[in-house]
């Protein structure tokens, strides 16, 4: 899982 902004 990867979360970026």
From Swiss-Prot:
Residues where Sulfotyrosine is found: 1, 3
CC annotations in GO: extracellular region
Keyword match Secreted: yes
Entry's Gene Ontology molecular function annotations: growth factor activity
Name the record gives this protein: Phytosulfokine-alpha
Range of residues in the leader sequence: none
The protein's role, per its UniProt record: In presence of 2,4-D, stimulates proliferation of the cells, but does not stimulate differentiation into the somatic embryos.
Localization annotation: Secreted
Keywords for the protein's UniProt record, in alphabetical order: Growth factor, Secreted, Sulfation
Keyword Lyase: no
Protein's organism: Daucus carota
Post-translational modification: Sulfation is important for activity and for the binding to a putative membrane receptor.
Protein family (similarity comment): Belongs to the phytosulfokine family.
Major site of localization recorded for this protein: secreted
Domain of life: Eukaryota
């Amino acid at each position: 899982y990867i979360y970026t902004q």
